[in-house]
Amino acid sequence: MESSRLRLLPVLGAALLLLLPLLGAGAQEDAELQPRALDIYSAVDDASHEKELPRRQLRAPGAVLQIEALQEVLKKLKSKRIPIYEKKYGQVPMCDAGEQCAVRKGARIGKLCDCPRGTSCNSFLLKCL
């Protein structure tokens, strides 16, 4: 008798867990049907309650010069040809012996170029030795 109760208890628990989402979904549908949000999202576009933001001056004295300078830089960057070895990810250009091959930023070291055969990038001097 008690062994049948012990077997029945997990089965009833599993059935209850399966039915809980179904019961909760019906309560959510009822909550979604309430008309409390209808006044916020009305179908009629009424812009009288909206404030108009103040317009900033577009023609500030230094702004025109800055825009022109940025446009010149963009033109130069667009016309600049990127070598094939820089386009390929994971490859860096070759540098000469004694040339700076890395940059240190805090505890990190960034590789600028590959050292030629027979030399390696010294992590203290950051040069090909």
Curated annotation (Swiss-Prot):
<dbReference type="GO" id="GO:0009267">
    <property type="term" value="P:cellular response to starvation"/>
</dbReference>
<dbReference type="InterPro" id="IPR009106">
    <property type="entry name" value="CART"/>
</dbReference>
<dbReference type="GO" id="GO:0046850">
    <property type="term" value="P:regulation of bone remodeling"/>
</dbReference>
<dbReference type="GO" id="GO:0007218">
    <property type="term" value="P:neuropeptide signaling pathway"/>
</dbReference>
<feature type="disulfide bond">
    <location>
        <begin position="115"/>
        <end position="128"/>
    </location>
</feature>
<keyword id="KW-0732">Signal</keyword>
<feature type="disulfide bond">
    <location>
        <begin position="101"/>
        <end position="121"/>
    </location>
</feature>
<comment type="function">
    <text>Satiety factor closely associated with the actions of leptin and neuropeptide y; this anorectic peptide inhibits both normal and starvation-induced feeding and completely blocks the feeding response induced by neuropeptide Y and regulated by leptin in the hypothalamus.</text>
</comment>
<keyword id="KW-1015">Disulfide bond</keyword>
<dbReference type="GO" id="GO:0005615">
    <property type="term" value="C:extracellular space"/>
</dbReference>
<dbReference type="GO" id="GO:0045202">
    <property type="term" value="C:synapse"/>
</dbReference>
<dbReference type="GO" id="GO:0001678">
    <property type="term" value="P:intracellular glucose homeostasis"/>
</dbReference>
<dbReference type="Pfam" id="PF06373">
    <property type="entry name" value="CART"/>
</dbReference>
<dbReference type="GO" id="GO:0045779">
    <property type="term" value="P:negative regulation of bone resorption"/>
</dbReference>
<keyword id="KW-0529">Neurotransmitter</keyword>
<dbReference type="GO" id="GO:0007268">
    <property type="term" value="P:chemical synaptic transmission"/>
</dbReference>
<feature type="signal peptide">
    <location>
        <begin position="1"/>
        <end position="27"/>
    </location>
</feature>
<dbReference type="GO" id="GO:0032812">
    <property type="term" value="P:positive regulation of epinephrine secretion"/>
</dbReference>
<feature type="modified residue" description="Phosphoserine">
    <location>
        <position position="48"/>
    </location>
</feature>
<keyword id="KW-0597">Phosphoprotein</keyword>
<dbReference type="GO" id="GO:0001696">
    <property type="term" value="P:gastric acid secretion"/>
</dbReference>
<dbReference type="GO" id="GO:0007186">
    <property type="term" value="P:G protein-coupled receptor signaling pathway"/>
</dbReference>
<keyword id="KW-0165">Cleavage on pair of basic residues</keyword>
<dbReference type="GO" id="GO:0050796">
    <property type="term" value="P:regulation of insulin secretion"/>
</dbReference>
<dbReference type="GO" id="GO:0005184">
    <property type="term" value="F:neuropeptide hormone activity"/>
</dbReference>
<dbReference type="InterPro" id="IPR036722">
    <property type="entry name" value="CART_C_sf"/>
</dbReference>
<dbReference type="GO" id="GO:0008343">
    <property type="term" value="P:adult feeding behavior"/>
</dbReference>
<dbReference type="GO" id="GO:0043278">
    <property type="term" value="P:response to morphine"/>
</dbReference>
<dbReference type="GO" id="GO:0051971">
    <property type="term" value="P:positive regulation of transmission of nerve impulse"/>
</dbReference>
<keyword id="KW-0964">Secreted</keyword>
<dbReference type="GO" id="GO:0070093">
    <property type="term" value="P:negative regulation of glucagon secretion"/>
</dbReference>
<feature type="modified residue" description="Phosphotyrosine">
    <location>
        <position position="41"/>
    </location>
</feature>
<dbReference type="GO" id="GO:0032922">
    <property type="term" value="P:circadian regulation of gene expression"/>
</dbReference>
<protein>
    <recommendedName>
        <fullName>Cocaine- and amphetamine-regulated transcript protein</fullName>
    </recommendedName>
</protein>
<dbReference type="GO" id="GO:0032099">
    <property type="term" value="P:negative regulation of appetite"/>
</dbReference>
<feature type="disulfide bond">
    <location>
        <begin position="95"/>
        <end position="113"/>
    </location>
</feature>
<dbReference type="GO" id="GO:0043410">
    <property type="term" value="P:positive regulation of MAPK cascade"/>
</dbReference>
<dbReference type="GO" id="GO:0070253">
    <property type="term" value="P:somatostatin secretion"/>
</dbReference>
<keyword id="KW-0527">Neuropeptide</keyword>
<dbReference type="GO" id="GO:0030141">
    <property type="term" value="C:secretory granule"/>
</dbReference>
<comment type="similarity">
    <text>Belongs to the CART family.</text>
</comment>
<dbReference type="GO" id="GO:0045777">
    <property type="term" value="P:positive regulation of blood pressure"/>
</dbReference>
